[in-house]
C-alpha cells in the first residue's frame, strides 16, 4: 500500500506455464519445412491467462536455472471445433486407439494402438502438430461406439467411407486406399480394449500394434483433430527441496511447485494424473520448505545475488 514494498521471508512460486502465451509458443515452435507456423493452429484447453509472465521474469531477468524443452507440453488431440480457450476435457477425442487417424492428405502417420490410451493420449496433440495444417482426423466405425468417453460434439456421420471422406473434405481416392490397406492388414485375434490384445496389423506402415480391427461396419464417424495444449514443460530447475536454483545453487527461501517446475519430472510424453501429482507433491514440499525457511529468520534476508527482485515479485504475486 502507498508504494511500500513488503519483503517476504520466503516465497513459493506456483504461477503455471506459458501455454496461453501464443507469441512464446510461436517463438518456441518456429516455422516448419512447409513454411507453416504450427503454434498458430494450437488450441488452449484451459485459461487464456497462463502466459508465463513470472516464469519469463525469473528466467530472463534474474537468471534462474531452466529445465525442459519449450516445445514439449501436455498436448492432446482435441476436437477441431473446440474454442480457442477453456474447451476443457469434454473436447478431448478418446477414440483414437479404436480406429485410425489420417492427416489432411488421407494418410495414416502413427501407430494408433501403441499402448494403453492413458499412456499415449497426451502425445497425440504433438503428432497432429507435425502434420500438414496441424490437423488430423480420427476415423471409427459403429463397433467403437460405447467404448470411449463421448466428446461434447458429435462426430461427422456417414453410411460409407467414401461419403465420410467427402464430408470431412479429404481426398477420396487416397483416403479409400489408406482404409483398404489398413483393413486388409488387420489380423484380428481376441479383441479386448482393456488389455494389450493380439489384434494387430501386418504388412502396412505404420503398423497398428493392438486393437486393430477392420473399419467396415457402418455407420462411420470422423472427428477433425487439432493440437490442444494443457500445460508446458519448460520450467525452473529445482531439486527434491523444491528450491529454485541460480547458477546451480539452491535459493534459501525461494521455492517452486506445479507447472512452473514440471520439466524436472516430465521430459516428453505423459501418463494420466502426473500433472496433478507434481502439483500435489511439490506443493507440499515447497510449502513445508518455505515455512521452515521463514521460521529460521527474524527478518527477511537478501536472497542470493540476482534473486532479490524475483523474491519480491513472487511474494507480491503470491499475496495478490
Residue ranges of predicted features:
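Short acidic/polar mixed-charge low-complexity motifs
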Residues: 2-4, 107
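Conserved mid-domain beta->alpha element of the FAD-binding
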Residues: 268-278
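Internal hydrophobic alpha-helix adjacent to the cofactor/substrate pocket in enzyme cavities
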Residues: 57-65, 176, 278-300
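Active-site-proximal substrate-binding core of FAD-dependent oxidoreductases
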Residues: 66-80, 288-320
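Mobile, glycine/GP-rich and aromatic-enriched active-site lid/loop segments adjacent to catalytic centers
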Residues: 23, 45-51, 56-270
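N-terminal low-complexity, intrinsically disordered patches enriched in charged
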Residues: 25-26, 115, 272, 282, ...
Amino acid at each position: 500500500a502507498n508504494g511500500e514494498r513488503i519483503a517476504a521471508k520466503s516465497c513459493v512460486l506456483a504461477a503455471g506455464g506459458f501455454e496461453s502465451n501464443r507469441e512464446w509458443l510461436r517463438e518456441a515452435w518456429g516455422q516448419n519445412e512447409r513454411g507453416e507456423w504450427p503454434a498458430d493452429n494450437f488450441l488452449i484447453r484451459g485459461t487464456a491467462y497462463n502466459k508465463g509472465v513470472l516464469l519469463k521474469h525469473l528466467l530472463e531477468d534474474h537468471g534462474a536455472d531452466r529445465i525442459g524443452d519449450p516445445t514439449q507440453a501436455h498436448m492432446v488431440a482435441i476436437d477441431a471445433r473446440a474454442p480457442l480457450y477453456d474447451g476443457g476435457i469434454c473436447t478431448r477425442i478418446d477414440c483414437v486407439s479404436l480406429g485410425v487417424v489420417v492427416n489432411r492428405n488421407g494418410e495414416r502417420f502413427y501407430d494408433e494402438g501403441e499402448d494403453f490410451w492413458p499412456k499415449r493420449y497426451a502425445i497425440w496433440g504433438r503428432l497432429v502438430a507435425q502434420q500438414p495444417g496441424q490437423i488430423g482426423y480420427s476415423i471409427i466405425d459403429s463397433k467403437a461406439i460405447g467404448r470411449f468417453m463421448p466428446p461434447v460434439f458429435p462426430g461427422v456421420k456417414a453410411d460409407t467411407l467414401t461419403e465420410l471422406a467427402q464430408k470431412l473434405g479429404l481426398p477420396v481416392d487416397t483416403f479409400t486406399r489408406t482404409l483398404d490397406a489398413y483393413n486388409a492388414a488387420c489380423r484380428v485375434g481376441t479383441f479386448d480394449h482393456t488389455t494389450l490384445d493380439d489384434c494387430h496389423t501386418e504388412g502396412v506402415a505404420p503398423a497398428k500394434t493392438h486393437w486393430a480391427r477392420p473399419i467396415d461396419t457402418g455407420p462411420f464417424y470422423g472427428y477433425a483433430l487439432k493440437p490442444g495444449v494443457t500445460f508446458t514443460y519448460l520450467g525452473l530447475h529445482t531439486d527434491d527441496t523444491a528450491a529454485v536454483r541460480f547458477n546451480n545453487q539452491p535459493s534459501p527461501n525461494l521455492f517452486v511447485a506445479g507447472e512452473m517446475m514440471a520439466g524436472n519430472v516430465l521430459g516428453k510424453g505423459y501418463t494420466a494424473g502426473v500433472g496433478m501429482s507434481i502439483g500435489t507433491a511439490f506443493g507440499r514440499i515447497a510449502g513445508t520448505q518455505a515455512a521452515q525457511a521463514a521460521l529460521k529468520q527474524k527478518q527477511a534476508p537478501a536472497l542470493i545475488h540476482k534473486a532479490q527482485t524475483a523474491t519480491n515479485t513472487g511474494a507480491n504475486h503470491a499475496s495478490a
